Design a protein with these regions (language model features):
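Structured C-terminal helix/loop/strand segments within mature extracytoplasmic catalytic/sensor domains
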Residues: 1-124
Length: 124
């Protein structure tokens, strides 16, 4: 399944979607898929980990994508150009109907600290 998805990540979620963008760049190192109602799951085969996230923010996957990007950024060894993609996904800009930036979403400092500690401890 991972090989098939790595060859055609577009088939998982479609153009420009979080799942597609991550798997296009990270290939078989990450398999992720959004579900209904803010559920996100991922397999990180190199780390021997599965990740399941459930967040109810009123916008189904928006906050879950931010958390999943932070998890991947912290736990998966990345190539030189990959941190920028994950940072853009873990800290998206919020714009109003006029296109004016009104804020950002981001993973909490507590989550980033916990992920950093896990990664540094070699628990992954």
């Amino acid at each position: 399944l991972r090989e098939a998805v790595a060859k055609a990540p577009f088939m998982v979620a479609g153009t420009g979607r979080f799942d597609t963008r991550v798997m296009e760049r990270l290939h078989e190192r990450v398999f992720c898929k959004v579900g209904a109602e803010g559920v996100y799951c991922a397999a990180l085969p190199g780390q021997g980990l599965g990740v399941a996230i459930k967040i109810d923010d009123g916008n189904n996957a928006r906050a879950a994508e931010v958390v999943m990007a932070a998890v991947i950024e912290a736990l998966v060894p990345l190539l030189a150009d990959e941190p920028a993609l994950l940072r853009s996904l873990s800290e998206p800009t919020l714009r109003n109907w006029n296109g004016i930036e009104v804020g950002r979403l981001r993973a909490s400092a507590a989550l980033r600290g916990a992920l950093s500690a896990q990664s540094a401890a070699g628990a992954v």
